[in-house]
C-alpha cells in the first residue's frame, strides 16, 4: 500500500515541498531565512487580521481606534506590537535572505530571483501602506512625502498623485484605500511566495560552494525541518524580546501625535528598514533624479545575473569579491544611518558619497573584481 502522503493530491504537494524534498547536505544557517520569512508572513497575516477586527479606516477615528486596541481590547497591545515589530523582523530576514542570494550567487536561478525581487517590492509597498494606517504625524507626512514623489513623473505626474490620493491631498479617501490595499497585498505576497518556491523546486537549492549538489542530497525532513524549527524559535525569541521589553525602540515618537495637516514635523523619515533608500533619494538635489535613484537602488537587483562576470558561482572562494561584498554591507549600514539624520552638513556629503559608492560597487567594482579573480586563476 502506498503512503497517503505520497498519493493524496494535496498531501503529495506538501510532501514534495517539505518532507521528501532532496536538499543539499551542506546548506548553512543562511538558508534558514526562507522558512523564517514564511513564518513572518503567517504571523503578520494573523496579527493583522485581529487588528483589522477593531481598526477603523476613517481619518476621524483611525488614531483613536489604535489607542482603543492598545487600551481596551484583550491582549490588543501585544497584538499591535507583534504586528509592528513583526514588520521589522520581516525586513531583517528579507535583507539577510537577499544578502545570502548575492553572496552565494543564487541569482543565477533567474525565475526564482525575479519573483523574489517582485516580492521585495510588494512587501515594501505593503509595509509603507501599513505605516500610514495609525494616522499619526509620521503616518500622514510619510504618506504625503512618498506619494508626492510620483509628481516627478513628467506630464502625468500630478494627475497620478491626485488619482492615488483620491482628492487634492492625503485625506479620508487615501486612508481607506491604503487600508484596503494593506489588507489584500499580504495574500498576493503569499501567492507570489508559492510561485517563488515552485520555481526554486524546479532547480533545487543552491549551496555555499555554488557547485551542483545533485550527487549529495539528503531528505528535507527530519534534517532541515528540525533546523528550521530552531531558526523559528530564535526568531520568535528575538521578536518577543522586542515586543515585551522595547516595543517602541524602532518606532518614531512623532507617530504618537495624531495627524495634523497644519503642522509639519521637524524631521520626516520612514521606518528604519527604508532609511537606506530614503538616503539615496535625498542625496540627489533633483526630484526626478532622486525618484529614479530610489527605484534603481532596489531594481538594480534584477541586473545581478547580468553583472555576474565570475567563472565561479559563489563568493566562497573569491576573497576580493568577499571584501567588496562586506564593503557594500557597510555602505548600506552607513546609508541607513544617514537616512535618519537631518539634512545638514556633514550628513549631506556623507549621504552623497555613500550613494555614489553603492551604485559604483555593484555596477563597476564587483564585476571588475570577478574578472580579476578569473585572470588570477588563469580561467
Swiss-Prot record:
Keywords: Electron transport, Heme, Iron, Membrane, Metal-binding, Mitochondrion, Mitochondrion inner membrane, Respiratory chain, Transmembrane, Transmembrane helix, Transport, Ubiquinone. Pfam families: Cytochrom_B_C, Cytochrome_B. The chain crosses the membrane at residues 33-53, 77-98, 113-133, 178-198, 226-246, 288-308, 320-340, 347-367. GO terms for molecular function: metal ion binding; ubiquinol-cytochrome-c reductase activity. Its main location: mitochondrion. A ubiquinone binds at residue 201. GO terms for cellular component: mitochondrial inner membrane; respiratory chain complex III. Heme b b566 binds at residues 97, 196. GO terms for biological process: mitochondrial electron transport, ubiquinol to cytochrome c. Heme 1 (or BL or b562) is low-potential and absorbs at about 562 nm, and heme 2 (or BH or b566) is high-potential and absorbs at about 566 nm. This is Cytochrome b.
Amino acid at each position: 500500500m502506498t503512503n497517503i502522503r505520497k498519493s493524496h493530491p494535496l498531501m503529495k504537494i506538501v510532501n514534495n515541498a517539505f518532507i521528501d524534498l532532496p536538499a543539499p547536505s551542506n546548506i548553512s544557517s543562511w538558508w534558514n531565512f526562507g522558512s523564517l520569512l514564511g513564518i513572518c508572513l503567517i504571523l503578520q497575516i494573523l496579527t493583522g487580521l485581529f487588528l483589522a477586527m477593531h481598526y477603523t479606516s476613517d481619518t476621524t477615528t483611525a488614531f483613536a481606534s489604535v489607542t482603543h486596541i492598545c487600551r481596551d481590547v484583550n491582549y490588543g497591545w501585544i497584538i499591535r506590537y507583534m504586528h509592528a515589530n513583526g514588520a521589522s523582523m520581516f525586513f531583517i530576514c528579507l535583507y539577510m535572505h537577499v544578502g545570502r542570494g548575492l553572496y552565494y550567487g543564487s541569482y543565477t536561478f533567474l525565475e526564482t530571483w525575479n519573483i523574489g525581487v517582485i516580492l521585495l517590492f510588494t512587501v515594501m509597498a505593503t509595509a509603507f501602506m501599513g505605516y500610514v494606517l495609525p494616522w499619526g504625524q509620521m503616518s500622514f507626512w510619510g504618506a504625503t512625502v512618498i506619494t508626492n514623489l510620483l509628481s516627478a513623473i513628467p506630464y502625468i505626474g500630478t494627475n497620478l498623485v491626485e488619482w492615488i490620493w483620491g482628492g487634492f491631498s492625503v485625506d479620508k479617501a487615501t486612508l481607506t484605500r491604503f487600508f484596503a490595499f494593506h489588507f489584500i497585498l499580504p495574500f498576493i505576497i503569499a501567492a507570489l511566495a508559492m510561485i517563488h518556491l515552485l520555481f526554486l523546486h524546479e532547480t533545487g537549492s543552491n549551496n555555499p560552494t555554488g557547485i551542483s549538489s545533485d550527487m549529495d542530497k539528503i531528505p528535507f525532513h527530519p534534517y532541515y525541518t528540525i533546523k528550521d524549527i530552531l531558526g523559528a524559535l530564535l526568531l520568535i525569541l528575538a521578536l518577543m524580546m522586542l515586543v515585551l521589553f522595547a516595543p517602541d525602540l524602532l518606532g518614531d515618537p512623532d507617530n504618537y501625535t495624531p495627524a495634523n495637516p497644519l503642522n509639519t514635523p521637524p524631521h520626516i523619515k520612514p521606518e528604519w528598514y527604508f532609511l537606506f533608500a530614503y538616503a539615496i533619494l535625498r542625496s540627489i538635489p533633483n526630484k526626478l533624479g532622486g525618484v529614479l535613484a530610489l527605484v534603481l537602488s532596489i531594481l538594480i537587483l534584477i541586473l545581478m545575473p547580468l553583472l555576474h562576470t565570475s567563472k565561479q558561482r559563489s563568493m566562497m572562494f573569491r576573497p576580493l569579491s568577499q571584501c567588496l561584498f562586506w564593503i557594500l554591507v557597510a555602505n548600506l549600514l552607513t546609508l541607513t544611518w544617514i537616512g535618519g539624520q537631518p539634512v545638514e552638513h556633514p550628513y549631506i556629503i556623507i549621504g552623497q558619497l555613500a550613494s555614489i559608492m553603492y551604485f559604483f560597487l555593484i555596477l563597476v567594482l564587483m564585476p571588475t573584481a570577478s574578472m580579476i579573480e578569473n585572470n588570477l586563476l588563469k580561467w
